Amino acid sequence: MNIYVANINFRAQEDQLKQLFSEFGEVSSVKIVTDRETGRSRGFGFVEMPNDADAQKAIANLNGKDFHSRSLVVNEARPPKG
């Protein structure tokens, strides 16, 4: 399952996010979206977890959790409209 994660601290690293989600199961990939021109974090990203039950557990436990002094917004990623 692909998980959308918002309100990520701009200094947070992908490996830190992976470690956080790994508490709930296997993480196959983590991507923090960056600005193309500056390379700076845009404050959101995606975590891919192969097991849907683990992903749901991570969403339930991490939505609203404080991570590097910011409250995460975590939910199932939805395909872009269009």
Task: Identify the residue ranges that each predicted region occupies.
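Intrinsically disordered, low-complexity RNA-binding regions enriched in Gly/Arg/Ser/Tyr
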Residues: 1-42, 48-82
